[in-house]
Amino acid sequence: RVGPPLRLEQVADVTLARHQLLADELPWREVRARLEGLRTAPSRVPPWIRDLSWVVVAMGITLLMQPGWANLAVAGAAALLVVGLIRVSRHSRTTASLLPAIAAFAACTVVLLAAQAGWIDGGALRTVFPAIAILLPGGLLFTGISELIASQMVAGTARLAFAVMQLAMAASGILIAVQLVHPDPALLVNARIDQLGLVAPLLGVVLIGGGIVLNEAVDIRMLPWILLVLATTVAAQILGQLWAPGTGVGTFLGATAAVVGSRVVAVLRPRLSRLVVFLPSFWVLVPGSLGLLTVSQVELSPE
């Protein structure tokens, strides 16, 4: 029987149960009983807090992509709109099917109108993507590629096809919003501002890590390890961007740091799930590294 995907708190519980079983700390019967009730177990965090935590994550990503005070406020408002659409989609199959396109259209419209009014600085797309980052299928892309590498062709191809379709729908929503608002082409240039200095990436990592811990109801004791891998990922990504700006070197180094960092944590703390400390890094890498920002800029950039 296929059920909903496991939350990270459930993944952590599975890893802990496996470790305790292999270490003879718990009998098989107790481990089996724990695993059987795991999928139906309620989250430790109320649903409304889990939903609002996405706004925190979006603001954290904004601090990395477009660190400006006004941009932070507008991205937070757009993310709140996306969260509202996510809640609606739980009761509407049509909305759920078209959610990436609808959410991208709504968020992009809000940000472009704010940019047209002169409320935010820098490239508008860099303020759009943090608001819709929660819908970008970074985990699916990683899992699909991993399955293809492991010769699991059917599962890997299916995941990649679904992830690419999600990205295409998000891109179409952005393009429609641009056609509707028809902003000044200069607002669509990939220009980054930096009004907060070194505090921006530090605070961004904390907000992303804390928001994901709330949303996935992860044990708070795992937060330091999640923040460590996130900080390592961001540092490697920044160094790569400084070394080779305008290329994928920063993304490659960031992804490598996330993989290596999570493996090191798993060795140091075998009771912790490597997946739990690894996946949050995708919210750092995904918005500007999956091609969505680049493709949208190519489609919309002024001649």
How should each PLM-predicted stretch be described?
Residues 1-39:
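Soluble N-terminal domains of membrane-associated systems
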Residues 29-42, 56-67, 84-95, 180-193, ...:
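Short juxtamembrane and helix-loop transition motifs at transmembrane-helix boundaries
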Residues 44-144, 149, 215-216, 220:
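Core alpha-helical transmembrane segments of integral membrane proteins
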Residues 52-56, 76-84, 105, 202-208, ...:
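Hydrophobic alpha-helical segments embedded in the membrane of multi-pass proteins
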Residues 58, 82, 86, 107, ...:
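Alpha-helical transmembrane segments of polytopic integral membrane proteins
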Residues 118-123, 181-196, 300-302:
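Membrane-interface helix termini and inter-helical loops of multi-pass transporters
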Residues 127-131, 143-146, 151-167, 194-201, ...:
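C-terminal transmembrane helix-loop-helix hairpin of multi-pass membrane proteins
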Residues 165-178, 200-212:
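Alpha-helical transmembrane segments of multi-pass integral membrane proteins
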